[in-house]
Amino acid sequence: MNPETLKFIEASIKTIPDYPKPGILFRDITSLIENAEAFKATIDLLAEHYRDQGITKIVGTEARGFIFGAPVAFAMGLGFVPVRKPGKLPRAVIEESYALEYGTDTLQLHTDAIVPGDKVLVVDDLLATGGTVDATVKLIRRAGGEVADAAFIISLPSLGGDARLTAAGIKVVSLVELAGE
């Protein structure tokens, strides 16, 4: 990946201190997607990186995974599959629950969206603890798909998501790695 493009993408992401609570450095991707040149560079970089790797579907998790996953799928001429919270998908679904800091959450996938033999790229905006993507990967595998990689715009390695996904056999690709929470 082009180092100059990666620096441009990183410079387009604003950091908001003490949001949503004191001590947190919030990584704001809206500043990136508001900038047409930076947004296009991000999509083009991911699409080009994965173009010749046999990917058959792009999966994005609710909600910001849609922002990046759908245009990457379009740029690659592939279908986009949304993974959503309960009650948002109209057809038959499979679901996977996962732990949060305080409680659990659940994600759903249409039962016919991924078929055996699909080689899937998971795209999301940010990798923190990895819980959401780990649940997404479990859904894809239960549906018979193979997860090629999980690609993120931002990774926060100190929160353990990179290690968690790698331990689960998932290759992690992040355009920008940032310190902090």
Swiss-Prot record:
Pfam families: Pribosyltran. Its main location: cytoplasm. GO terms for biological process: adenine salvage; AMP salvage; purine ribonucleoside salvage. One of its GO terms (molecular function) is adenine phosphoribosyltransferase activity. InterPro entries: Ade_phspho_trans (IPR005764), Adenine_PRTase (IPR050120), PRibTrfase_dom (IPR000836), PRTase-like (IPR029057). It catalyses: AMP + diphosphate = 5-phospho-alpha-D-ribose 1-diphosphate + adenine. Its EC number is 2.4.2.7. Pathway: Purine metabolism; AMP biosynthesis via salvage pathway; AMP from adenine: step 1/1. It is found in: Cytoplasm. It is an enzyme of class 2 (transferase). Keywords: Cytoplasm, Glycosyltransferase, Purine salvage, Transferase. GO terms for cellular component: cytosol. Homodimer. Belongs to the purine/pyrimidine phosphoribosyltransferase family. Catalyzes a salvage reaction resulting in the formation of AMP, that is energically less costly than de novo synthesis. This is Adenine phosphoribosyltransferase. The gene is apt.
